[in-house]
Structure formats: structure tokens, C-alpha cells
Amino acid sequence: MQADLFDAEQTGIRTRLGEQAWVLRGFALPWLDALLPALRAVIAQAPLRHMATPGGFTMSVALTNCGALGWTTDAHGYRYRPDDPQTGLPWPPMPQAFAQLTREAAAQAGFAGFDPDACLVNRYAPGARMSLHQDKNERDFGAPIVSVSLGLPAMFLFGGARRDERPARIPLLHGDVAVWGGVDRLRYHGVMPLAEGQHPLLGRQRINFTLRRAGA
């Protein structure tokens, strides 16, 4: 209950991360009744899995996808593909609630008209992390990235144009939506190891889904 109250108190606040980068505090909270069932349906159709990087490391974050294109990694590299490599079937359709929330969040951050075609769903268990990286597998860097946080709080790292630039640390709470694009589109970013905890709705996990325009 205390976590829910704190999340609610943050709703409507905008935290600026850069010239064209924002965190919209609590923006996803009014959408939860639609988001959570849709999320469960996506995971039921395309289960979460731990993928291996080209270097042979298994990612600590479990992931899946929905939408026309899904992000994957294996020994051959990072790429988007229209089908689930485990089944050969198309990824689940992007839920309408995901797409509409994304369009509205993007517009609030100055990116009206954003139309995502790819949604990467990440599940962080305690201890899972995401190393600093750039999102460079998309064909068009003109579209923003919209990232929705649900469940346990995480410490988001938002760096600069080079990996060696010291990143800012920004807490992301249940319902927060981060949006970055334009001059900030290729900034390095990551997530520190998730702290142990128990969220009243989602338990011992953080769910993050990130929407992009990956195709032409």
C-alpha cells in the first residue's frame, strides 16, 4: 500500500533527463487495468526467455516481444525479426493499450505522431541488470524510444554519446514512462542490478516494456 501511495503522489511530475528526454512520473498508472491483462496474454503466447549475446553470455533479464517486429540476440548478432525464433510463429500482436499509451506518452514528451511497430518486454528479477548500451538496431533513429516501468523500482542509468561518459542515475518507479529521442536518441543507457523487494501487484520483479519504430 505504501508503494502505491508513493507512486500516486508522483503522478503528473515530469523529470527532464536531457534536451529531448523525459520521465513522465506515474503516466502509466491509469492504464494498469488494461496493461496487466494484455501483458499476461503476450507472455502466455510468447513466454519470457533468457537469450544469449553474440559473445556467449546469457542475459540476466528475461525477455519476449510483441508487435510486427521483435528484438532478438544470438551467436549471429542483435537484430529485429518478425517471428519468434523458438516457435517460428509471428510475435503476438501489440496490444492496443500498449500502442495508445505509447502514442500519448510520446506526444507529451514532444514526439507527436509516433507509431511503434516493436515492443520488447523485459522481466527483471532481483539481481538482474542491463549494461550500458545504445539502441542502434532500428532502421530509423528519428523516432523516439518509449519505456514503461511496472513493479519494483529500478535505478536507470542515462549516459552520454560515449560509453565512458558517467551516466546519471534516475529512479524509475511503478507506472513511470521514460521517453527519449531527437538529439538524445543514441545516448547510452542501462539499469543497475535490481534490488530485492516485493511489489504489491507484481511481486519480486520489475516488468519493463520498451516500444520503438524498428522497421522502415
What are these regions (language model features)?
Residues 1-216:
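Non-heme Fe(II) oxygenase metal-center motifs and adjacent flexible, charged/small-residue loops
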